[in-house]
């Protein structure tokens, strides 16, 4: 297929477009971007007929900051007839064989969501016809490709496929997380989503486990501390402001009424460092770099608040600088990931894992 369809947050189409333009160029897949403000999706139109196929296979979704989900796509199917929308879609998917799942989706906008009831109903007959044509297996198979049909408006859809090992497990790339009734703030969901994004499920028992020591810089009122506590960790919560009383009653939290930028841990046995401070992103990055150089943590998750303009450029500059500084200070083995999570707004979430191949004492 010729195109790559990418889901993103509404208002971040420019950032998603700039990123895919750069990343596709690195893979020598030429093309141009089609994007409109607040559409919540971007289409990268490749010059080569198989450009979308190449990108969906060779470009890791997890390496993209602003894309929630992506799939190799056909040209837009416009003006699908109300009397028979199924046949043109089945025909457009004739090159897809034995897919393991069907997702009929929309972009994440209020206008597109009005189609969600239709999408649910439409899935049933479409699934039956795709099984008959051989594009879809009779039984779902999580190891096979996923068929995507994304309606961007009534009778207008992009169709295509993604590989299950390079795809979000969620419809539209949106995780469905529940806000706990006793969580101190909605920001709690950001860290919950970050753990799911950056730590594979099969590794969570080892890397996100009870008894670990953690530090939360800028913790008040305790949204991120809450996620650490519910996972059984012992938390040093650093903030001049007050902490949630119920969190303090758990006995797992020690509150340090200090400036997060000046705090130094008393003991050097911290596995997780987390930080969600409303501060200039470069300053937060410098703080994390200092902690890494001092050897004060093994893994960190932190948020970078984004400027109003040049957001992709700013994020990449900060991440590139961080990599350079770590290497200059003898930290040559690390994993650095960044994602604009669903529960993020004008910010991105970064994960830094120092020396992943070395066991934690």
Curated annotation (Swiss-Prot):
As recorded in UniProt, coiled-coil segments are none
State the protein's name: Ribosomal RNA large subunit methyltransferase M
Q: Where does S-adenosyl-L-methionine bind?
A: 187, 220-223, 239, 259, 276
Where does the record place the catalytic residues?
305 (proton acceptor)
Gene assigned in the entry: rlmM
* Keywords on record: Cytoplasm, Methyltransferase, rRNA processing, S-adenosyl-L-methionine, Transferase
**UniProt xrefs under InterPro entries:** RlmM_FDX, RlmM_THUMP-like, RNA_MeTrfase_FtsJ_dom, rRNA_MeTrfase_M, SAM-dependent_MTases_sf
Q: What GO terms are given for molecular function?
A: S-adenosylmethionine-dependent methyltransferase activity
- Entry keyword annotation includes Magnesium: no
Which PANTHER family does its entry note? Answer: RIBOSOMAL RNA LARGE SUBUNIT METHYLTRANSFERASE M, RIBOSOMAL RNA METHYLTRANSFERASE FTSJ DOMAIN-CONTAINING PROTEIN
Q: Which Pfam families match?
A: FtsJ (PF01728), RlmM_FDX (PF18125), RLMM_N (PF21239)
Per its record, the protein catalyses: cytidine(2498) in 23S rRNA + S-adenosyl-L-methionine = 2'-O-methylcytidine(2498) in 23S rRNA + S-adenosyl-L-homocysteine + H(+)
Report the locations given in the UniProt record. Answer: Cytoplasm
Q: Name one GO biological process term.
A: methylation
Q: Which EC class is this protein assigned?
A: transferase
Name the job this protein performs: Catalyzes the 2'-O-methylation at nucleotide C2498 in 23S rRNA.
Q: Name one GO cellular component term.
A: cytoplasm
- Where this protein primarily resides, as one coarse class? cytoplasm
* Provenance organism: Shewanella sp. (strain MR-7)
The entry describes its oligomerization and partners as: Monomer.
Keyword Cytoplasm (UniProt): yes
What family does the entry list?
Answer: Belongs to the class I-like SAM-binding methyltransferase superfamily. RNA methyltransferase RlmE family. RlmM subfamily.
**In the Enzyme Commission scheme, what number(s) does this protein have?**
2.1.1.186
